[in-house]
């Protein structure tokens, strides 16, 4: 393993942490409707649980309503039940074979709770990134111990890893700020 391998590996892992954080943020409801909100809803499809996107078409009807059109008529009730039980605080209404999912307006108190959740998720993501930095620095120290690189090379590589860490932590902070602004916008 070389210094380049360590740096490349840690950067890829940090990027994956950012992607996972973005996915977590997408699940947090803001006042506006977006189809990503229902991505993790699982529907009972002939005995097996499948993502809602595999049994229905998701569209935005307007800024506050998601339209869900199951591909099979007999799935309408099951899809509606799955949305209702997904613990998202949503109350779907069926009109024929179209399920309308209106987004209720968030109360001020709920907005504050959601910003706390966003901050907490952000901290978790930053801790994960810092843990990756620690792992990379330990790998570099092992390379020095095994006499594969000099201490100067290790120090330079450590500085590079720190720069990567700072960059990714700043990206998390930016995502948190953006999501908080989105939540607090009435």
UniProtKB/Swiss-Prot annotation:
InterPro entries: Ribosome_recyc_fac, Ribosome_recyc_fac_dom, RRF_sf. It holds the Pfam family RRF. CDD domains: RRF. It is found in: Cytoplasm. GO terms for molecular function: ribosomal large subunit binding. SUPFAM superfamilies: Ribosome recycling factor, RRF. Its main location: cytoplasm. Keywords: Cytoplasm, Protein biosynthesis. GO terms for biological process: cytoplasmic translational termination. One of its GO terms (cellular component) is cytosol. Belongs to the RRF family. HAMAP family: RRF (MF_00040). Responsible for the release of ribosomes from messenger RNA at the termination of protein biosynthesis. May increase the efficiency of translation by recycling ribosomes from one round of translation to another. This is Ribosome-recycling factor. It comes from Burkholderia cenocepacia (strain ATCC BAA-245 / DSM 16553 / LMG 16656 / NCTC 13227 / J2315 / CF5610) (Burkholderia cepacia (strain J2315)). The gene is frr.
């Amino acid at each position: 393993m070389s210094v380049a391998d360590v740096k490349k590996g840690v950067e890829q892992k940090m990027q994956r942490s950012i992607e996972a954080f973005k996915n977590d943020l997408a699940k947090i409801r803001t006042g506006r409707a977006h189809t990503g909100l229902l991505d993790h809803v699982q529907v009972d499809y002939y005995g097996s649980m499948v993502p809602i996107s595999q049994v229905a078409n998701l569209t935005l009807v307007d800024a506050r309503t998601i339209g869900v059109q199951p591909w099979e008529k007999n799935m309408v009730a099951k899809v509606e039940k799955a949305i209702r039980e997904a613990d998202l605080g949503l109350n779907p209404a069926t009109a024929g074979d179209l399920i309308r999912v209106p987004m209720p307006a968030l109360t001020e108190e709920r907005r504050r709770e959601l910003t706390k959740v966003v901050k907490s998720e952000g901290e978790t993501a930053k801790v994960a990134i810092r843990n990756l930095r620690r792992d990379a620095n330990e790998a570099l120290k092992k390379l020095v111990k095994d006499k594969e690189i000099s201490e100067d090379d290790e120090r330079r590589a450590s500085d590079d890893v720190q720069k990567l860490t700072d960059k990714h932590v700043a990206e998390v902070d930016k995502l948190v700020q953006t999501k908080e602004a989105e939540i607090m916008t009435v």
